[in-house]
Amino acid sequence: MDFFLFAYMYGGGSYMKCPRCLNTDPSWFYKGSRGWYCRRCISFQRVMIEETMEPVSLQDVKMEAGEYSMQYPLTKQQKQLSDQLIEKIETGDILCHCVCGAGKTELVVGVISHYLRHGKKVCFAIARRQVVLEVAQRLQKYFTYAKVIAVCGGRTQVIDGDLIVCTTHQLYRYYQAFDLLILDEPDAFPFHGDPVLHGLAQTACIGRTVYLTATPDDTLRKRVEEGTLLSLQLHVRPHGKPIPVPVIHTGPLWLLLVHLFVWLRSHRNHPRIVFVPSRSMCHRLSALISLTQKCFHVTSQDENRDEIIDMYRKSKNGVIVATTVLERGVTIPDVDVCVFGADSPSFNEAALIQMAGRAGRSFSNPYGDVLFLCMERSDLCHRCRKQIIEDNSYLMQEGRSL
């Protein structure tokens, strides 16, 4: 055994650490002809352990890049959290724990502007590719004088701008590049539970990190409890109406199909999303629905999913059957939601909350409708329902009209 690795494994683990993904597990290190390298993050290009990584060189931020304007002003609650974020960000990392549909992107516009005005580099990192393009377009509308770029699979020709929006996978390009890193939905697949992506996020940021999510995982909650992460919370959507509480129906498959088709018909004046737990069910159920009406379907395996989602958006009051690929980030105005097979072990509480949170976001249909269809009684579904009711209770505490 090489002395370097032997000393690491039996000498307290203080001799080898990947400078990019921060791995210290000796089983991932390998010695090639050029020396030691980490195999855990080798898919992002080989990094030699003995070499010193240099911070990536990016262009300076334009002086006017921080100027912004939004079509609609922030609500009182949004403005309060936005101001707190700007005030507290200098003291440490922050978790913005906001309900689905609270306007998380708009909440961080102020702190993004604050950093850009001081010539600081900012990155908005997102777990899923299809959300990157939408968020980049939205931020470009707000920051009209800034060069906002989207970096994701198929869009890597330009990787530098005043404001960078990218997938978490693309953070490997930005070693020690950002003064502010905004991690959107860090509890979402594929970022959640991936130590390589977590390491890339840590090494890309030399300043502060803001975590945006409605469903913080145990790691973030523990940091809040330990006092290493400040939590700012927002339980109110901009329109001030409650989050739709799921109606739960349990029964055999044939009865669930009856409930589904009755629901599809009764909500035909709105766009509808039917979430399912697997790709195979997605294809089978969409084929069945297509016998009575036009129906789209999309999964993570569809290479043209952006085009499918765009066609669905343009269809009038259409139906789309989807896996969890649409559970986050994608907003469909006036949409109603059904989760078929909500009791499936493929779903966790966070996924159910996120799927239910697609409904009731728009001012034109602030109440929305959410239906959970289960083969068996599900404690998970009832916990999700209880959490949404608890979030809605904050409206009552503020004396807001429900």
Provide a role label for each language-model segment.
Residues 70-92:
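N-terminal pre-P-loop "Q-motif" helix
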Residues 97-105, 115, 120-132, 263-289:
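Conserved strand-helix element at the start of the C-terminal RecA-like helicase core
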Residues 140-173:
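Inter-Walker segment of RecA-like/P-loop motor cores
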Residues 180, 185-249, 259:
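Post-DEXD/H (motif II) to motif III coupling segment of the RecA-like Helicase ATP-binding lobe
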Residues 185-188, 313-318, 324-366, 374-379:
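Conserved RecA-like helicase motor core of SF1/SF2 enzymes
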Residues 206-210, 215-219, 358-384:
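Conserved segment of the helicase C-terminal RecA-like domain
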Residues 228-286, 294-295:
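Conserved interdomain linker/interface between the two RecA-like ATPase lobes of SF2 helicase motors
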